[in-house]
Regions:
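Catalytic cores and adjacent flexible loops of soluble metabolic enzymes
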Residues: 1-171
């Protein structure tokens, strides 16, 4: 368990599958890319089988708090962000696949007092700059942690660019 490993925090994920399936039918209506890992005939059914309900997230947060471990969650869409923000975690993570969702930043800026951890995988340099500029203009910059990441699992060593961390420090 996280407690036995002396973890300070755990991070879960929350998606609103129906929203993402409507936005990305080419992904969600097809079979899981690794059929032996699939929990359903389509990626949508696979994700639905794995997704925790908001009640389960509430229970996970309470369990974490019982053991002095910080609960957090990656939110993949606005509805998921709203649901998780209402649990009041110290921070919410925005995954690479959702880091350009400005409506999510807008809602969180007005309704969530915690910090934002934002993965910058899958972004161009211009998109990265636009995200930073937008967050600064919204007055959120003091609450932001940027993650240098490469969206690949596993990542080939040739694609790892750790020098980019210094670049992010320049913001």
């Amino acid at each position: 368990t996280a407690k036995a490993c002396k973890a300070d925090a755990v991070k879960f994920q929350k998606r609103t599958i129906s929203v993402l399936a409507a936005e990305r039918p080419n992904i969600y209506q097809n079979p899981h890319p690794n059929p032996w890992n699939a929990f359903g005939p389509t990626y949508e059914k696979h994700r639905e089988a794995l997704e925790f309900s908001i009640a389960q997230h509430r229970e996970l947060k309470e369990y974490c708090e019982t053991y002095g471990i910080e609960y957090s969650c990656s939110v993949w869409d606005l509805q998921a962000a709203i649901e998780i923000a209402l649990l009041n975690p110290a921070w919410i993570k925005i995954p690479s696949a959702s880091n350009l969702c400005l409506d999510m930043y807008d809602w969180l800026a007005d309704n969530f007092a915690g910090n934002f951890h934002i993965s910058l995988g899958m972004t161009t340099e211009k998109e990265e700059y636009d995200i930073v500029d937008y967050l600064k203009k919204k007055g959120l910059w003091s609450r932001v942690v940027l993650y240098n990441c490469t969206s690949g699992y596993p990542v080939d060593f040739k694609d790892v660019f750790l020098k980019n961390i210094a670049h992010l420090g320049g913001y």
